[in-house]
Amino acid sequence: MNANETKVERFLETTKVQFVIPVYQRNYDWKKIQCERLLDDILEVGSNDNLKVHFIGSIVYVHDDAYTTAKINELIIIDGQQRLTTITLIYLALYHLVKSMEEKSLADEIMETYLINKFAEESEKLKLRPTDNNDYALKCLLKDSNHADFESYSTLIANFDLFKKRITKENYQTIRQGLAKLMFVEISLDRSNDDPQRIFESLNSTGLDLSQADLIRNYILMGLSRIDQSKIYQNYWEVIEKFAKDETTNESKVSEFIRDFLTLETKNIPNKGSVYIKFKEKYPNLISSMDELERLLLRIKKLAMHYNKLLNPKKEPDKEIQKQLEYIAQLEINVAYPFLMQVYDDFNNNVIDKSTFISILNLVQSLTWRRFIVGLPTNALNKMFMSLYDKVDKNDYLFSVQKSLLQRSSTQRFPNNTEISNALKEKDVYNIKHKNTMYFLERLENYQNPEYVKIEDCVNITIEHIFPQNPDPKWRMELGIDQCDKIKEFYLNTIGNLTLSGNNGKLGNKSFSEKRNMNVDGKEQGYSYSRFWLNKSLREKTEWNLHEIKERTKMITERFMKIWEYPDIQIKSEDGNGEVNIFEIDDQSDKQLEYYVFCDQRTEVLTTSQLFCNIFKQLFDLQPESFFNTPIKDRINLSNKIEVYENKAYEQLNDTYFMCTNYTNAEKIDRIKEALSILKLEDELFIKYAENESNVYVV
């Protein structure tokens, strides 16, 4: 490796050289603010005689001693392509400006010194060779500053237009002087002696510049030959990038997709900033075998095709499946993607039929929506869906998934109908995410509805409070102050008091009879004239009070049970694996343990004392600072002095700290629960009692 400080001008004026941006590099994506900052720096240094140089970072390239047929030396840029491309655009804007000023000599100098290899073949003429789409855009700009031949959007062209606008007859000489002062560190690597991948990682160790997907793409492609790079990129990675894109926002989701892929492969959920590291750990020798690499990428590409439909439901041609995918997208059930991608693959391979697939999609919604209604934490879903596919029995597909979900307990449970019925009486379903409220009402409205009513995208349909948020005085006269206050405090935003209206602004705070009977110009306005199912029961009502809200809640609850069904299956008690969440333990007698599972790691133990000591040691390793700023410290009598325990039993947590263990088994279990709750790890500890009931212990 050679590193030298070099002037940008000197670097670009090198003859018979081409700076190649390899396919594994991310696309050119400098934003307006970055371009303007660089140009401002150039103007500042160009106008100040006291500033001799301006440092712009580094450019790293691999020198393979590879030459084209025209003896053009190819330098593979592995870091610095954004700066190099942007500076090329500035020179290109300068060229077109001085050309328009009829300064032919200066225009030719800029063109032939910094932009092209004058005597090279057409394909090798540009000194900078970006990836395919940018290469075409750059060639269009070289011919025509108005880029008439380039019809689609290009960041490269947008930034050129910015420079074209800002570089003028008044400042172009200052810009030339500033460009002449630009300095960078030129780092030249020799593939036979240096490790470009390792150097690339060290240059991007902060992760600020590149996404996890960028790093993984580079990891896959960088060590391959140019021919293999092109093959793998075009046949696999480019397709993966296309599939893993949210077409509504035009946002790349490759990093998220690979995270979901690793989740289903490893049964562990990587941190968002560790996806690249975990990918490398899972696949450490990718380029040692092209066959293995292609097999892996073929699987990833196949799953990406299904991921594309989860992100963009309209890509699914079947309208019934598409509708369920739209619901899942509306609820943002992204945590289910590792599971659903595999189910989608089974559907695609005819392992399951359409009916089963739709039932699975409905089941995922039922689980998620029921849990939301009763207020269960969403973080528990991550681990549920992470391993759910492992429970699939392909001979009894739907039942096996239902069984697995119904076997969960505590915060991972599938809420039953009684829980739902109780929750809907009080649940505020108005002051939640608007899209969730609309999902709820849209599904209620359209159950077995022959004419589907699309609510979310219809600006004329709004959520209506039957008893208004700011009631007219007539309400107090009709219901009395006490009942009005009670409804407003406890029932205002419950499902029993919410409906849909195409005229919410007009219904407003009027009395119930006025809301029901409103009919101006014969148009649909009041409840009596509404076509919505949600308003059907309101047509015959003569009053609206607490009793009516409760009755309507019962009616909607019955409909809820039909839409978000609780699986109607029988599960034998022996179907479970015997693992019990620590918070489900009621009987704290001295039964012998077999093992516990904490954070997906199984550990053999026999006694509650062993469990107590092990768990607190693991918790202390995970979050030591939390032991000192929460009640945990006092609950286990944490200290760095042994003498404080006198004749009491104690355990060493680490090299410095100790804790008291002089508690009954019930007290030990209680302290474990308290610590898990404080640290928000309620779903992480499961225990398994020994099956031989004769085995008991004292401590």
What are the residue ranges of the model-derived segments?
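Intrinsically disordered, charged low-complexity linkers and terminal tails
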Residues: 551, 558-699
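Glycine- and hydrophobic-rich flexible loops that cap the catalytic core of alpha/beta enzyme folds
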Residues: 2-274, 513, 519-533, 537-572
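Intrinsically disordered or highly flexible coil/loop and linker segments, enriched in small
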Residues: 47-51, 100-103, 162, 169-172, ...
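Short active-site loop/helix that positions an aromatic residue
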Residues: 84-100, 468-481, 619
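Secondary-structure capping and boundary motifs in well-ordered enzyme cores
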Residues: 76-83, 176-179, 188-195, 212, ...
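Betabetaalpha-Me/HNH-type nuclease active-site subdomain
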Residues: 44-73, 106, 393-538, 556-557, ...
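A cross-family structural signal marking well-folded subdomains
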Residues: 213-216, 221-440
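Active-site-adjacent bridging/hinge elements
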Residues: 9-16, 52-71, 169-176, 190, ...
